[in-house]
Amino acid sequence: EKVCPVDAITLKKGEAWIVDAKKCDQCGRCARVCTFGALEMPIGPNLFSRGMAESTKAVLSTFTPGKVLYVNFVMEVQPECDCMPTADTPLVQDQGILISDDIVAIETATLDLLDKATPLPQSKAADKDITTPGDLFLRVNGQDPRLAVGYAEELGLGKSSYELVEIKKKRK
Protein backbone atom coordinates (compact mmCIF):
# COMPACT_ATOMS: atom_id res chain seq x y z
CA GLU A 1 0.00 0.00 0.00
CA LYS A 2 2.79 2.44 0.92
CA VAL A 3 4.90 1.63 -2.15
CA CYS A 4 2.31 2.94 -4.66
CA PRO A 5 3.29 6.44 -5.85
CA VAL A 6 -0.27 7.25 -7.00
CA ASP A 7 -2.15 5.73 -4.03
CA ALA A 8 -3.92 3.21 -6.24
CA ILE A 9 -3.71 0.42 -3.64
CA THR A 10 -5.89 0.27 -0.54
CA LEU A 11 -6.54 -2.40 2.05
CA LYS A 12 -10.06 -2.77 3.33
CA LYS A 13 -9.95 -3.97 6.92
CA GLY A 14 -10.08 -7.76 7.01
CA GLU A 15 -10.36 -7.99 3.22
CA ALA A 16 -8.09 -8.24 0.22
CA TRP A 17 -5.95 -5.55 -1.35
CA ILE A 18 -7.79 -3.44 -3.90
CA VAL A 19 -6.04 -1.82 -6.87
CA ASP A 20 -7.87 1.14 -8.42
CA ALA A 21 -7.26 0.64 -12.16
CA LYS A 22 -8.18 4.26 -12.91
CA LYS A 23 -5.39 5.53 -10.63
CA CYS A 24 -2.78 2.85 -11.43
CA ASP A 25 -0.06 4.09 -13.79
CA GLN A 26 1.41 0.60 -14.42
CA CYS A 27 4.79 1.41 -12.84
CA GLY A 28 4.99 -2.11 -11.41
CA ARG A 29 6.47 -1.20 -8.02
CA CYS A 30 3.84 -3.21 -6.17
CA ALA A 31 4.50 -6.36 -8.19
CA ARG A 32 8.28 -6.02 -7.81
CA VAL A 33 8.23 -5.66 -4.03
CA CYS A 34 5.50 -8.20 -3.24
CA THR A 35 7.42 -11.01 -1.53
CA PHE A 36 4.57 -13.47 -2.07
CA GLY A 37 4.34 -13.06 -5.85
CA ALA A 38 0.65 -12.29 -5.43
CA LEU A 39 0.67 -9.28 -7.74
CA GLU A 40 1.37 -9.45 -11.45
CA MET A 41 1.61 -6.67 -13.96
CA PRO A 42 -0.77 -7.01 -16.90
CA ILE A 43 1.93 -5.63 -19.17
CA GLY A 44 4.69 -8.04 -20.21
CA PRO A 45 8.42 -7.29 -20.45
CA ASN A 46 8.41 -6.97 -24.25
CA LEU A 47 5.60 -4.43 -24.29
CA PHE A 48 7.12 -2.51 -21.38
CA SER A 49 10.57 -2.42 -23.02
CA ARG A 50 9.12 -1.30 -26.35
CA GLY A 51 7.17 1.41 -24.51
CA MET A 52 10.37 2.59 -22.81
CA ALA A 53 12.15 2.83 -26.17
CA GLU A 54 9.23 4.61 -27.83
CA SER A 55 8.95 7.05 -24.92
CA THR A 56 12.67 7.76 -25.18
CA LYS A 57 12.32 8.41 -28.90
CA ALA A 58 9.42 10.80 -28.26
CA VAL A 59 11.40 12.78 -25.68
CA LEU A 60 14.55 12.89 -27.82
CA SER A 61 12.54 14.13 -30.80
CA THR A 62 12.09 17.42 -28.93
CA PHE A 63 15.85 18.11 -29.01
CA THR A 64 18.00 19.25 -31.91
CA PRO A 65 19.80 16.19 -33.33
CA GLY A 66 23.45 16.07 -32.27
CA LYS A 67 22.84 18.39 -29.31
CA VAL A 68 22.35 15.73 -26.63
CA LEU A 69 25.12 14.19 -24.55
CA TYR A 70 24.48 11.13 -22.39
CA VAL A 71 26.27 10.59 -19.08
CA ASN A 72 25.84 7.32 -17.17
CA PHE A 73 27.12 7.22 -13.60
CA VAL A 74 27.53 3.47 -13.16
CA MET A 75 27.80 3.80 -9.41
CA GLU A 76 25.69 2.52 -6.52
CA VAL A 77 23.88 0.29 -9.03
CA GLN A 78 20.61 -0.68 -7.37
CA PRO A 79 18.70 -3.92 -7.97
CA GLU A 80 15.48 -2.04 -8.76
CA CYS A 81 14.61 0.95 -10.89
CA ASP A 82 15.87 4.21 -9.42
CA CYS A 83 12.23 5.28 -9.23
CA MET A 84 11.78 2.91 -6.29
CA PRO A 85 11.50 4.71 -2.95
CA THR A 86 14.16 2.64 -1.18
CA ALA A 87 17.86 1.94 -1.61
CA ASP A 88 19.57 -1.40 -1.22
CA THR A 89 23.13 -2.68 -1.18
CA PRO A 90 24.57 -2.02 -4.65
CA LEU A 91 24.63 -5.07 -6.92
CA VAL A 92 28.27 -4.53 -7.97
CA GLN A 93 31.26 -2.29 -7.28
CA ASP A 94 31.17 1.13 -8.91
CA GLN A 95 32.13 0.81 -12.59
CA GLY A 96 32.79 4.45 -13.43
CA ILE A 97 31.28 7.20 -15.54
CA LEU A 98 30.44 6.77 -19.23
CA ILE A 99 29.85 9.59 -21.71
CA SER A 100 28.54 9.31 -25.26
CA ASP A 101 26.50 11.09 -27.90
CA ASP A 102 24.76 7.77 -28.70
CA ILE A 103 22.14 6.59 -26.20
CA VAL A 104 22.10 3.01 -27.49
CA ALA A 105 25.90 2.70 -27.40
CA ILE A 106 26.18 4.06 -23.85
CA GLU A 107 23.41 1.80 -22.56
CA THR A 108 25.00 -1.22 -24.26
CA ALA A 109 28.42 -0.35 -22.82
CA THR A 110 26.90 0.11 -19.36
CA LEU A 111 25.18 -3.27 -19.49
CA ASP A 112 28.35 -4.93 -20.81
CA LEU A 113 30.35 -3.51 -17.88
CA LEU A 114 27.74 -4.70 -15.42
CA ASP A 115 27.68 -8.15 -17.03
CA LYS A 116 31.43 -8.50 -16.37
CA ALA A 117 31.18 -7.39 -12.73
CA THR A 118 30.97 -9.83 -9.85
CA PRO A 119 27.88 -9.33 -7.67
CA LEU A 120 28.54 -7.95 -4.20
CA PRO A 121 27.92 -9.99 -1.06
CA GLN A 122 24.87 -8.81 0.90
CA SER A 123 23.23 -7.49 -2.28
CA LYS A 124 19.93 -8.71 -3.70
CA ALA A 125 22.03 -10.87 -6.05
CA ALA A 126 23.62 -12.66 -3.08
CA ASP A 127 20.16 -13.06 -1.53
CA LYS A 128 19.30 -15.10 -4.63
CA ASP A 129 22.60 -17.04 -4.54
CA ILE A 130 23.89 -15.23 -7.63
CA THR A 131 27.65 -14.98 -7.21
CA THR A 132 28.95 -14.99 -10.79
CA PRO A 133 28.91 -12.23 -13.42
CA GLY A 134 26.49 -12.12 -16.36
CA ASP A 135 22.91 -11.01 -17.08
CA LEU A 136 22.65 -9.58 -13.59
CA PHE A 137 19.32 -7.74 -13.88
CA LEU A 138 17.71 -10.64 -15.69
CA ARG A 139 18.87 -13.06 -13.00
CA VAL A 140 18.01 -10.78 -10.07
CA ASN A 141 14.68 -9.35 -11.25
CA GLY A 142 13.64 -11.46 -14.19
CA GLN A 143 13.79 -8.33 -16.38
CA ASP A 144 16.14 -7.99 -19.34
CA PRO A 145 17.23 -4.36 -19.83
CA ARG A 146 18.72 -5.29 -23.20
CA LEU A 147 15.20 -5.59 -24.62
CA ALA A 148 14.63 -1.82 -24.35
CA VAL A 149 18.10 -1.11 -25.73
CA GLY A 150 17.43 -3.41 -28.68
CA TYR A 151 14.12 -1.73 -29.40
CA ALA A 152 15.81 1.68 -29.17
CA GLU A 153 18.29 0.56 -31.81
CA GLU A 154 15.44 -0.74 -34.01
CA LEU A 155 13.78 2.69 -33.72
CA GLY A 156 16.95 4.33 -35.01
CA LEU A 157 18.00 6.01 -31.75
CA GLY A 158 21.58 4.79 -32.09
CA LYS A 159 23.85 1.79 -32.61
CA SER A 160 24.81 -0.87 -30.09
CA SER A 161 28.43 -0.92 -31.30
CA TYR A 162 30.83 1.22 -29.32
CA GLU A 163 34.46 1.80 -28.47
CA LEU A 164 35.23 2.05 -24.77
CA VAL A 165 38.07 4.50 -24.14
CA GLU A 166 39.36 4.45 -20.58
CA ILE A 167 40.65 7.73 -19.19
CA LYS A 168 43.02 7.21 -16.31
CA LYS A 169 43.48 9.65 -13.46
CA LYS A 170 46.53 11.84 -13.96
CA ARG A 171 49.33 11.24 -11.48
CA LYS A 172 50.52 14.27 -9.56
Name each model-derived stretch.
Residues K2-K172:
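Extended, low-polarity segments enriched in aliphatic/aromatic residues
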